[in-house]
Amino acid sequence: MTEKKPIFFNRIIDKKGLRDLIAWSFSNFGTARTAEMADKIKDLGFHYATRAGVSISVDDLLVPPKKQELLEAAEKEIKTAQERYSRGEITEVERFQKVIDTWNSTNEELKNEVVRHFRNTDVLNSVYMMAFSGARGNLSQVRQLVGMRGLMANPQGEIIDLPIKTNFREGLTVTEYIISSYGARKGLVDTALRTADSGYLTRRLVDVSQDVIIREEDCETERGITLRSMTVGDKVLALQDRLLGRVVLNDVRHPQTGEVLVAKNQAISADLAKKIVDAGIEEVVVRSPLTCEATGSVCRLCYGWSLAHARLVDMGEAVGIIAAQSIGEPGTQLTMRTFHTGGVFTGEVARQERAPFAGTVEYGKKLRVRPYRTRHGDDAFIVETAGKLVVKGGQQRQEFDLSQGSIVLVADGETVAAGQLLAEVAQAARSVRKATEKVTKDVASDLAGQVKFVNLDAEEKRDRQGTTTRIAPKGGLIWVLSGEVYNLPPGAEPVVKNGDRIEAGAVLAETTVKTEHGGVVRLPEQQDSKGGREVEIITASVMLDKAKVLKETQQGREHYIIETATGQRFSLKAAPGTKVANGQVVAELIDDRYHTTTGGILKYADIEVAKKGKAKQGYEVLKGGTLLWIPEETHEVNKDISLLMVEDNQYVEAGTEVVKDIFCQNSGVVEVIQKNDILREIIIKPGELHLVDDPEAARLKHGTLARPGEEVLPGLVVDTLSQVDYLEDTPEGPAILLRPVQEFSVPDEPSVPSQDSSDGSGQSIRLRAVQRLPYKHDERVKSVDGVDLLRTQLVLEIGSEAPQLAADIEIVTDEVDPEAQRLQLVILESLIIRRDIAADQTQGSTFTSLLVKDGDHIGPGAVIARTDIKAKQAGEVQGIVRSGESVRRILVVTDSDRLRVETNGAKPTVKVGDLVRPGDELAKGVTAPETAAVMAVADDHVILRLARPYLVSPGAVLQIEEGDLVQRGDNLALLVFERAKTGDIIQGLPRIEELLEARHPKEKCVLAVRPGTCQVTYNSDDSVEIKVIEEDGTIQEYPVLPGQNPLVVDGQKVNLADPLTDGPVDPHDILSIYFEYYKPQGLLKAAQTSLEKVQSFLVNEVQSVYLSQGIEIADKHIEVIVRQMTSKVRIDDAGDTILLSGELMTLRQAEQANEPMALTGGAPAQYTPVLLGITKASLNTDSFISAASFQETTRVLTEAAIEGKSDWLRGLKENVIIGRLIPAGTGFNSYEESSNGDEEWEEGEDRLGQTHVISPEPESPKMTVNVTADLGEDVLIDDETAPHVIEKITGGARDFEFASSDVEEDELTEEDDDYGDEEEEDAF
C-alpha cells in the first residue's frame, strides 16, 4: 500500500463542517479511528478555547446604527396607514394587517442588518462567533439582543400591534417588559406539555413497530417506490439526501450515455447519490419497507443501509424500534402550535419581486388577472392563470414568473421606477394547503355622536333560530358626526325639542317618582344609604289590640307567643321586621285537641275541604264534620330480613322487640313489608284479634266500620267504634282484627275571632282564621310519636285593590298600657329616591329633589321626588329620536364639536350636508383641516362639524342603524374576514399525531373521485358549485361546504384524488378513491395501488411537518411505521373461503385464502384495504400479549381467550414480557437453526400464513473496505476492519463463522462483540 498524502483544509470549520468531517471519517475509516479523531479535535478545541477565553460582555453587543432609520421608516409607514384609516379608506382589519406586516418586515430587515454589521465590523466578535459557529445561541436570540424583540402575542394568542422596538442591550420599557412576559410563560407551559405528548407518541410508535425485525435476506419483490426531491416552504429535502443508503430496484442508467450508474439491488452510497444527481436524474425507483414482501418483517435489501454504520443492515436488527425512536425523539422539538396570530399574518411572507431598473411593465400572453383588494387595502390584481411579467427599459428586459394566486401591484403598460415592488409571488407548493377560517373584529366608535351611512345598504338576514342580523353586503362607510350624547335614565322625559339652543346647566329631561296607592309618608332615619334614600308610604295597617305579645326563649331561640283575651295562645310564624305576602300564615293556634299518639290512617266523615290548596299548606276546611283516625305504629327499617324477630300477622305485646334494636310501643298485629329480602317497614296495628271458623263470611266484612253494639260475626259484638280487618294467615289460622277508631269533631268555623281593619281610603287588611287539614282522606300517616290532624291558622288577607303589596310585621308598645306589646301589620309602599352620582359621565349631571315631608297625607299618583338631567355644555339639541315609546338618548351639538373655517373671501364650493376629509377643497385655496360634515355655509366662512368615517368591508354585521346616537366606545359593526389558519391548520406534534393516528381531519377538502375537467360556477349568494366532466362524459357534482374555497378554476384538468377545495386531505379518502377507481382491474392490483398512494402521501406529509421545523429524519423510518399502518385489509364478503366477513388480516393472507378459489372456481373473498392509526394497529397486532400490554388489557385478553388465540412470540415485547431472550441481534433465531446442521427445513405455514420456523439464513455478501493501515502498525479492531483482520489470520477463508471456526472464540470475539455493541448504541 502506498502512503497517502495528508490533506490540509484551511477554512473556518463550524458545526456543520465538523459534522461533515466526522461523517466522512466514519464512513471511510470506521468507528475506532473516528472516535480517536473526534477526541483529538475536542482537545484542540478546548485548548484554544481556553487560550482565547471567549466570553460575552455588554460591549460585544453591537447595535447596528441603521436601526434608527429602519424604525423611523416603519413608523412613517404605519402613520400613513393610520391616516388612511381615519379618512375611511381602509378598514380596521386592513390597518391592523398593515401594522403587523410592516413590523415583521422591519424586524426581518433589521435581522439581516445585524448580521451584515457584525460581518463588516468585527468578525471575531464573541457573540457573532458563538452564534454562527453553532456553539451557543442562534440568530433569533442574537436578534433580540441587538436588533429588536419584535411583535408579541397576548395570552389569547392574538398579536399585539405594539411591537417591542428595543432590544435587551438598550433595555425594555415597563410596558414592553410586561408584554414580553406573556410569551415567556407560554413557552414554559408549552415545553412541559410537549414532553408529555411526545413521550406518549414514542410509546405508541414503539408499540406498533416493535415486531419489525430484519428476518430475510431478499424478498425478491418487483415493486418499489419513486423518490424525488421535496420542498416545504423554503426548506428542501434534496434527492441526493433521500437516496443515501437505499437499494435501487432496477439498474439506474445515465440518461444520455446509457451507462449503468447503479446496478440492480446495489446500495447507493454518498458518491453514487451525487453521481445520479449530477447525471440529471430527477427520480429514482428504490426498494422500500413499504413494498417489501417478506412475511411479518422487512428484508435486508428493502431496508437498505443501517444508518448507524453506513452499510447494509444486519439480520436480526430491530429496525422497528429504531424507526419509532427516530420519529418520536425529535417530537419535543416540534412546536405544539405557533401563536395564533390575531390577524391574517402568517409566518411565511410571500416572495416579493421588485423592478431591477426603471421601465415599463408588460403582461405575458398567458397571464390572466382579476382586480383584487390586498390585505392592506391597496388595489391590485390577483393572478388567475399563471404567466410571465416582463419589465422593459432601454436595452434591458427581465421576466418574472407569476404563479396562480400571486398578487400583481402594477397594471399592464405602467411605468415603474427601479426598486419598485411589482408583485408578491405566492409559494406555489404550499398555497394549495392553506385553509382559512372566518374571524370577526369589532369596530368601535372613537367619538360620541350621530350615525350616518354613506353608500351603505343594510340587508336583514334571519338565521334558523329566527334572530335577525343586519349585514352590509357591499360594504360602505359609517360616518359618526360628533356631538355630546346624554343617556337618559329609565322613565325620563325630555323637556327640550330638536333645534333648541341651550345653555350649560339647562334641564334636558326630567324623571319623577310617583306613589301608586297614596297614604301617610314616613321617612326612615338613615338618610343616606348607598343606593339612595328610601321613602315609605303607609297604605293600611291593622293592630291586634285585644292580644298581647309575649317573648319566650326556647333552646336559645327567641320565639313570640300571642295570647288573646280568651286565653288562646298562638305561635307567631313570621318574625317581626319581615314582610308577609298576601295569603301567608302569620300565626298558628297552639292546640293539642287534635294530637294523636301514633301514626295511622285518616278518614273524613262529612268534612268538605277546598280542592285546590297545596298539600304542603294543608287542605282548608269548608264544612265541619268528623275525622276518623285508625291508629297504627309504623317503623321504617330498611335492614336485612334476617334481623326480623317476629312473623307477619303475629300478635305482639307492647315492648316486644320486633326487629333487632326496635321495640314496639303498642300491642297489636304485625304487618311486615319487605322487598327483595330487605325489610322496608314494620307496621303494628292495635286491636282485638279473634280467630274465625267461617272465613268466607269474615272476608266480606273486611274493611268495614262496625258501630258499638253491632254483631260482626255470630257471637262477636263490638263495644267501641272499630274497623274490621280480615287476616288470612296469622300463625294460628284465619282471624279478624277489630281496630279501634278515634273520632275528632271539627267545627264549621274556627273558634278564633278574625281581625279586620280598613283605613280611610277603603283598603282593607284582615287576619282570617282558617282550619287546615294536613292529610288527605284515606292517607296513611307514618309516625311513631304522633301528629297533629288539624291546624288553626291566622292568614293575612289584603283587599283586592292591592293584593301585590306585602305587609310588614311590627311589634309596637301599646299607647294606653306601656307594659303590653301589640302586634301590628302595616302595608307599605317603599320608594327609592335616586342619589345623584357623578360617576356616570354619559348621563350628564343629575339633580334630585324630594317634594314631601314626614307625616304628610298624600293621594294616589302624587309626585314624591323629581330628578332633573342638566346639560354640561351649551349647544344645540338634536337627535331626539322618538323610537316607539320613549327617548333614550339626547344629542347636544356643542361649540367644541364645531369648527369655523374662514374662506378668505372666496365663495365656498361645498353645500350643507357634504362630508369632507382633510385636504378636500372647501373654497378656492381653502382645504378642510379634519374629517367633518358641513353644517352651514356663508359667503366668507364654512362651519364644519367634526366627524369620523369608518370603512366597512363587504359582509360586515352592522350593530347600529342610520340616525342612531352612539357613545364613544360603542360598537358600530363587526367586520367578518378570512385569515389563513396559522401555518398548516395545526403544526408540529398535533399534526404528526393526526397523520399517524389516521384521523379524519375537520373541514377536510373535497377530492376528485375520477379525473376530468372542472366546471366552476360562482353563484350570487356566494356559494360555489364544482362539477367535473369525466373522460367518458359523465358529469360528477361535488358539494362545497360553506367556508370552503375552490382551489380549481374553470376548465382546469384534474387528476384522480386531486383536492378541489382548500383544507387538509383525509388519507382515508385517498385510499377509498384509488381503490374504487382501480377495482375493475382486479382486487389485488387495486389494493396495492391504493395502499401505495396513501403510503406515499403519509410519508411525505410526516416528512414535511418535520422538515418545516428543520428536523431531518430518514424516509425509511417513517416508511417502517406507515407499513404497519397500511398492512391490513377488511374482509367485506367471505365468498366461499373460510374467512369471516369483517375480519382484519394482511393483504397477503387474504390473497392466500383466495388462491385455492381460483383453482376450484369458488367465489373469492372481497376485501377493502383499511388504514389503521398507530393505536388501532397496535391493538390489532397478531400478538395478543403485545396488544394487552399496550391498552385495554382486559378487553384484549378476554377476546383472545374467547377466540382461542395463540401468540407466536414474534416481536420483542412479547418475549420481554414472558422473559425469554428477545429474537433480535444475537438472539435472532436463524443462528440456532442453521447451526443444527439440518439445512433443508421447510417452512410450516398455518392458515394465516404465519411462519413457525425460519429457514437458515443465506450467506450475506460482506462489504469490503480498503484498510489503508498495514496490520503491523495499527491493530484497532472494529466493525469495519474485523473481517480483514480475520481474513489475514484465517488465510482468506471468507465463509467464516465464529462458532465453527478453528480459532478459539475468546481470542477474538470478546473484544469485538463488546466493542461493536457499545459502539452501535452510542454511535448516534
Swiss-Prot record:
User: Where along the chain is Zn(2+) bound?
Assistant: C219, C292, C299, C302
> What are the annotated GO cellular component locations?
DNA-directed RNA polymerase complex
| Keyword terms | DNA-directed RNA polymerase, Metal-binding, Nucleotidyltransferase, Transcription, Transferase, Zinc
Q: Which domain of life is it from?
A: Bacteria
Q: Which cofactor does it need?
A: Zn(2+)
Reactions that this protein is recorded to catalyse = RNA(n) + a ribonucleoside 5'-triphosphate = RNA(n+1) + diphosphate
* EC number(s) from the headed UniProt entry: 2.7.7.6
GO terms classed as biological process: DNA-templated transcription
As to how many cofactors bind and how, the note says: Binds 1 Zn(2+) ion per subunit.
MF-aspect GO terms? DNA binding; DNA-directed RNA polymerase activity; zinc ion binding
InterPro entries from the entry?
A: DNA-dir_RpoC2_beta_pp, DNA-dir_RpoC_beta_prime, RNA_pol_Rpb1_3, RNA_pol_Rpb1_3_sf, RNA_pol_Rpb1_4, RNA_pol_Rpb1_5, Rpb1_funnel_sf
Region annotation (Disordered) ranges: 1293-1324
Q: Which family does it belong to?
A: Belongs to the RNA polymerase beta' chain family. RpoC2 subfamily.
The protein's assembly and partners: In cyanobacteria the RNAP catalytic core is composed of 2 alpha, 1 beta, 1 beta', 1 gamma and 1 omega subunit. When a sigma factor is associated with the core the holoenzyme is formed, which can initiate transcription.
**What is the designated name of this protein?**
DNA-directed RNA polymerase subunit beta'
